[in-house]
């Protein structure tokens, strides 16, 4: 009986440690993302001007982060409706994802890292050759679209505005 109790106690302890590690890695990711945005606002604004399929969680999070004056915005991660995995997956599409990954302590998959690094290199070379970050973003973002520019203006404007205001 004592052995069973000890085994159950140990299992519960290990489960809580694993859950704690996951929350810690989410905090590291969010802190790295917000910090990177604060250091490179122009890059983000130009990227989101041409970005597609921006997760709704990102604009919701950006709006909520607006209300915080310090890093206590990480308490938003306790909200079960926030899909951090979705945000992390989207972040891998950012051309500078390797910066975020490095700041977050190397969290993420190797394929996400390789993809982010390659995009960052192609964006950097495109910026050097064209002198325009906006054209580099649109080149790196791809050229296929389902609708015209008018369909993107409102959603992109809302996301860019929320990010710009929330993370200043």
From Swiss-Prot:
The GPI-anchor is attached to the protein in the endoplasmic reticulum and serves to target the protein to the cell surface. There, the glucosamine-inositol phospholipid moiety is cleaved off and the GPI-modified mannoprotein is covalently attached via its lipidless GPI glycan remnant to the 1,6-beta-glucan of the outer cell wall layer. Induction: Expression is regulated upon white-opaque switching. Repressed by RIM101 and alpha pheromone, and up-regulated upon interaction with macrophages. It is found in: Secreted, Cell wall; Membrane. Glycans are attached at residue 83. Residues 111-149 are annotated as: Disordered. This is Repressed By RIM101 protein 2. Residues 144-168 form a propeptide. It is a lipid-anchor; GPI-anchor. Keywords: Cell wall, Glycoprotein, GPI-anchor, Hydrolase, Lipoprotein, Membrane, Secreted, Signal. One of its GO terms (molecular function) is hydrolase activity. Its EC number is 3.1.1.-. Pfam families: SRP1_TIP1. It comes from Candida albicans (strain SC5314 / ATCC MYA-2876). Belongs to the SRP1/TIP1 family.
